């Protein structure tokens, strides 16, 4: 993997990541395909939205005992018929999500299988082996994600252990002679001194890119913005920066303007299945009765398959009837919206209109976002 910074405008970055499997223009948004699928869509449909890279979850694929089946296909790319780059999440956030089922130790995480209740152990080394078998283009270290709020002492203890896990992940990754990329994950809660230490130590270890974890876990948006503004200037300019699990369109813009290159989140696909659709002027809640007789396009500025072929009234009908096609068409649109947003951000830097774009975005959506 090779990252090239093409342009920097007041902290916002325009870049390019070269993988063996293709090029990713940044800023970039990665749809979440937890089990090797972006829910309801084929990989061809995902690609048609402008998606360059997908995130899959190594932890969940491992829990489903799919590792050996995937190896029979060669790798995860062949298994799911996606031949662009794939990034895999190690499972740190999922471990955080099932905290009532786990016991975290220096060695790793002991937990009960959330499906069958069997005892399972996951170490940093095991996580590297799982992701190696998947053939991930970007591998994530195993870390611990702390909740919000958390006391300083607890945040420090967790962050220091995550650093030791990062060292072990780094060592095992290179023992496997993995030629793909390994990203470190910055932790430390809302405490700038802990974030500083995490950044410093991860840079000393040396990673191909740096992710910012432990955000969007319930903290006020202002806290997240302050942490991003504090961290990003400390990171190497020649390495990509990835904000994990964030978020809504305005979150992407705020992350980008502070120096983030890569994003992932379930929001566009999950919200699509719930009938919450992102449009140029904000959000359309398509199940609302006012759309029953609305024969206009969902978004006249959108070029996706859904907007080019179906009315709001039809999408309302599908949603009210709980038809699978509704979820599919909604997902196509929301993903295309996110990819158009990323393309607009790239264009704004290329043309020197970043500040104008941000102002226009908020002017259009001020009364509609939630």
Swiss-Prot record:
Which cofactor(s) does the record list?
Zn(2+)
What pathway or pathways are given for this protein in its record?
A: tRNA modification; tRNA-queuosine biosynthesis
> Which residues are involved in binding substrate?
89-93, 143, 187, 214
Q: Which InterPro entries match?
A: ArchSynthase1/Queuine_TRR, TGT, TGT-like_sf, tRNA_ribo_trans-like
- Spell out the residue ranges making up region: RNA binding: 245-251, 269-273
The EC designation for this entry is 2.4.2.29
Task: Quote one Gene Ontology molecular function term.
Answer: tRNA-guanosine(34) queuine transglycosylase activity
Function, as annotated: Catalyzes the base-exchange of a guanine (G) residue with the queuine precursor 7-aminomethyl-7-deazaguanine (PreQ1) at position 34 (anticodon wobble position) in tRNAs with GU(N) anticodons (tRNA-Asp, -Asn, -His and -Tyr). Catalysis occurs through a double-displacement mechanism. The nucleophile active site attacks the C1' of nucleotide 34 to detach the guanine base from the RNA, forming a covalent enzyme-RNA intermediate. The proton acceptor active site deprotonates the incoming PreQ1, allowing a nucleophilic attack on the C1' of the ribose to form the product.
Q: Which PANTHER family match?
A: QUEUINE TRNA-RIBOSYLTRANSFERASE
Identify this protein by name.
Queuine tRNA-ribosyltransferase
Organism, as annotated: Baumannia cicadellinicola subsp. Homalodisca coagulata
Q: Report the gene name.
A: tgt
């Amino acid at each position: 993997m090779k990252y090239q910074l093409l342009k920097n405008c007041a902290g916002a970055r325009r870049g390019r990541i070269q993988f063996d499997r293709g090029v990713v223009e940044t800023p970039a948004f990665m749809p979440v395909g937890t089990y090797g699928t972006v829910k309801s869509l084929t990989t061809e449909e995902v690609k048609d939205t402008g998606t360059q890279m997908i995130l899959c979850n190594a932890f969940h694929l491992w829990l489903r005992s799919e590792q050996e089946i995937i190896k029979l296909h060669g790798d995860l790319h062949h298994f799911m018929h996606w031949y662009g780059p794939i990034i895999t999440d190690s499972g740190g956030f999922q471990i955080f999500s099932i905290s009532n089922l786990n016991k975290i130790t220096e060695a790793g995480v002991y937990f009960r299988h959330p499906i069958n209740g069997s005892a399972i152990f996951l170490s940093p080394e095991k996580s590297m082996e799982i992701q190696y078998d998947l053939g991930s283009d970007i591998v994530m270290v195993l870390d611990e994600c702390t909740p919000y709020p958390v006391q300083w002492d607890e945040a420090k203890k967790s962050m220091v252990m995550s650093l030791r896990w990062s060292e072990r992940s780094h060592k095992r990754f290179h023992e496997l002679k993995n030629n793909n990329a390994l990203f470190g994950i910055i932790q430390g809660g809302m405490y700038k001194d802990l974030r500083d230490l995490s950044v410093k130590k991860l840079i000393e270890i040396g990673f191909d890119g740096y992710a910012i974890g432990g955000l969007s876990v319930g903290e006020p948006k202002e806290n997240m913005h302050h942490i991003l503004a504090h961290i990003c200037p400390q990171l190497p300019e020649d390495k990509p920066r990835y904000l994990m699990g964030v978020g809504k369109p305005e979150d992407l813009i705020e992350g980008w303007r502070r120096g983030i290159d890569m994003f992932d989140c379930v929001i566009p696909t999950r919200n699509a299945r719930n009938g919450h659709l992102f449009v140029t002027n904000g959000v359309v809640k398509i199940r609302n009765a006012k759309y029953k007789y609305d024969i206009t396009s969902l978004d006249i500025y959108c070029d996706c398959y859904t907007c080019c072929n179906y009315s709001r009234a039809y999408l309302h009908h599908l949603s009210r009837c709980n038809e699978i096609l509704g979820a599919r068409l909604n997902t196509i649109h929301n993903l295309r919206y996110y990819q158009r947003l990323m393309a607009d951000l790239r264009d704004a830097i290329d043309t020197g209109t970043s500040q104008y774009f941000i102002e226009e975005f908020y002017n259009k959506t001020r009364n509609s976002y939630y």
